Amino acid sequence: IACAPRFSICNSDKECCKGLRCQSRIANMWPTFCLV
């Protein structure tokens, strides 16, 4: 599974920001922004 680049938009499980999950900069928003 490829990880999305730092600060890019994470819009699917295949674009993980941390582990296998997208980490949100703002709670309950989707797509989320990568923080790592």
Swiss-Prot record:
Principal subcellular localisation of the protein: secreted
Tissue localization of expression: Expressed by the venom gland.
Compartments where located: Secreted
Disulfide-linked positions: 3-17, 10-22, 16-34
A GO term from the CC aspect: extracellular region
Assigned keywords, A-Z: Calcium channel impairing toxin, Disulfide bond, Ion channel impairing toxin, Knottin, Neurotoxin, Secreted, Toxin, Voltage-gated calcium channel impairing toxin
Pfam families, A to Z: Toxin_12 (PF07740)
InterPro entries: Huwentoxin-1 (IPR011696)
Tagged with keyword Transferase: no
Keyword Secreted: yes
A GO molecular function held by the record: ion channel inhibitor activity
Notes on the domains: The presence of a 'disulfide through disulfide knot' structurally defines this protein as a knottin.
Family indicated by similarity: Belongs to the neurotoxin 10 (Hwtx-1) family. 53 (PNTx27C4) subfamily.
Functional note: Neurotoxin. Causes spastic paralysis and death in mice. Moderate inhibitor of L-type calcium channels (Cav1/CACNA1).
Protein name: Neurotoxin PRTx26An0C3
